[in-house]
Amino acid sequence: MQFDLKATDTSTLARAGTITTDHGVIETPIFMPVGTVGTVKGVHQRELEQDINPDVILGNTYHLYLRPTTTILEKAGGIHKFMNWNRNILTDSGGYQVYSLSANRKIKEEGVKFKSHIDGSYHMFTPENVMEIQRTIGADIIMAFDECAPYPCDYQYAKRSMHMTHRWLERCLTHLDKTPLKYDYRQTFFPIVQGSTYKDLRKQSAEYIASVGAEGNAIGGLSVGEPAEEMYEMTAVVTEILPKDKPRYLMGVGTPINILENIALGIDMFDCVMPTRNGRNGMLFTAFGSINIKNKKWVDDFSEIDSMNITWVDTAYSKAYLRHLFTVNEMLGRQIATIHNLGFYLWLVREARKHILAGDFGVWKSKMVKQMDNRL
């Protein structure tokens, strides 16, 4: 993998760059649609490629390990061939999913024993086998196995958790060196900064992660319930330390406003289920605020979904029609909302990139944050 920094904004820490892997170029800042189980929910790969057009999508190690299983993925020739997606894929390590199974998992030094949400069977994730699983899945960018501390958590827990994440990272690196590639392209490994919402722990973790010298770095354990201002504060502490010549990935973030504020702090990569999940529940994101399409006010609004016409669905259907589809629980409504939201998120980061390159990102960001902070 190669990262080339093209421009840095003069009034903020925002950056524009390119990440080049064997599956193509990723222009940053980038938003990665979440394809948890090998699909971006409700979106054909053709629509994803032609209409939404992301350079990279995300898959989830925990879910892909359970279904379809690594046996099937290896037989298929890896995740790209299995799902017919020839662009970049990033897999998270499953650490967050295991964290979210709090009642059904046990964390110890060796790894995490957890109970499958599907059939109740028991499984063990260790730094070693998670590296093997990710080799078999075959994503272009793979993540370290970490523990995501809950929010809130006390200082001592956060400290113990951070140190264990660092020890697990050493085991990930050692085992990755011994585990050959399965397919005919390279994989890039990102370690993860932890430390909850404690500045000194975030600083300590960022310094340790920076010292590893990986090709890119991630920030985990944020957007787990803490106030947005705390998230920004922790991000600022970490981006000050992480190397400037490597991409920085803020995991699981976030709202359109969260994304712009974190781009301004020097983040390059984002993923979040919000555009797809909220879309399936009738929430649309636009440049002028959010729309709850289920509200009665849209029942006879025959204007197009979004006059900005970012994706073809925006002008193909009216708000009244989309509301009708949700009212009668028609799956097409969820698909339209999902395509719209993902198209908007990709438009937003691409506009951010344009303004970073043009040198006026700070002014544009301030205007957009005000505009988007509305309910229409």
Question: Model-flagged regions — what are they?
Answer:
Residues 1-182, 296-299:
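Non-catalytic, usually N-terminal nucleic-acid engagement modules in DNA/RNA processing proteins
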Residues 1-20, 26-32, 41-42, 146-153, ...:
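C-terminal extensions of enzymes
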Residues 175, 179, 184-305:
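Glycine-rich phosphate/ribose-binding loops and adjacent secondary-structure elements
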Residues 33, 63-65, 96-97, 149-150, ...:
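Short, solvent-exposed loop/turn segments at secondary-structure junctions
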Residues 151-155, 159, 216-222, 331-334:
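Glycine- and acidic
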Residues 129, 133, 137, 160, ...:
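A non-catalytic, amphipathic alpha-helix used as a structural packing/dimerization or gating element
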Residues 24, 57, 92, 134, ...:
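Conserved, mostly hydrophobic/aromatic
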Residues 138, 169, 173-176, 180, ...:
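Structural signal for hydrophobic packing residues in well-ordered secondary-structure cores
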